[in-house]
Amino acid sequence: GGDPKAEAAHRDRWMAISAPFVREADGTLTAEEVVRVEQRARGLMFLEDPGRLITSEYDRDRRWTRTLLHEVGSDGEPLVLEDRSSQDRYADPGALAMVAGPYGRMVVREHGGGAFRTGRGSSPKGDLPFLSQQDLGTGETKVLWRCEPGAYETVVALPWARGFFGAFVTRRESKTAPPNYVIRRPGLSGFDAVTDFPDPQPSLRGIKKQRVTYERADGVPLSATLYLPADHQPGERLPLLVWGYPREYNDASTAGQVSGSTDRFTRLSGTSHLFLVTQGYAVMDGATMPIIGDAETMNDTFIAQLVASAKAAIDAAAELGVADPDRVGVAGHSYGEIGRAH
């Protein structure tokens, strides 16, 4: 079932070799099938109960992912925990939290019949990270906590003690406050600070940052984060750098989704392109440049879509009155450099 061009009921299967791992006379080891998956196997996670495991699979042509909970040895259908386009950020349920099991092996972190998930929480308003719990009996999910607008906060640690869930640790930052660690408790709005790291670059706090949304000529919604120098005055047109990275999508609905957060702390290091903001440039960072189509033909319109995305970003900055359309550069890292070439 490994040939993607051939029809197959199941493309992969997970096998197990039992201890004491004695080889047959011909030198082979006997392996037994544990579970089969319809698409190509992508991952395997264990629970503390050895009779249950979680598999993930991926359909390359549709760019579709599924996560399933299996009862080993059961003839029943597995419980679907996730079933979505891998490019649909708004529907991403987050990653399953793991914990060291009784034998030192990482297993899914369970509590009260459910598994914890942490994710970016992408939305039309930007990323709002969350902590949720998914019922492993029904598949239903309940959000336990979500980052509020005005800050950017991600879950970094859950209690390691099995059977206990009374607090969790997050990494909290904002436009003006550097990342620090805090302890939160479910159901309570406040938090207890763990660290108090100072601002390492206070001279950068005046940099202006905002999310910009606009459309490509074909109607595909695009977005970018616009950075302006601290001393920028309304109506002043600056040289512009558009920094982007082309990504492939099957449809426009997922291509136009917003990601990232303007509430993150700005910190510059290395050869960051954002240093240009301190030199009087406007920078459109993370300008979306989707290449939409099926896997077989999307490259036929690659250059046209790439150029259209860059033009839309430049036009948007010019319409805002912050960029001089005659002084523009387009660049990006790795694959993003293709944008500069065209």
Task: Annotate each predicted stretch with a short phrase.
Residues 1-17, 29-119, 147-171, 200-213, ...:
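Conserved beta-propeller blade repeats
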Residues 156-340:
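Serine-hydrolase catalytic core recognition
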Residues 7-23, 136-137, 293-308:
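C-terminal/domain-terminus segments
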Residues 11-28, 67-74, 130-139, 183-186:
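Beta-propeller blade signature
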Residues 119-120, 131:
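A cross-family structural signal marking well-folded subdomains
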Residues 126-130, 329-331:
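Long, heptad-repeat coiled-coil alpha-helices that serve as cytosolic signaling/dimerization stalks
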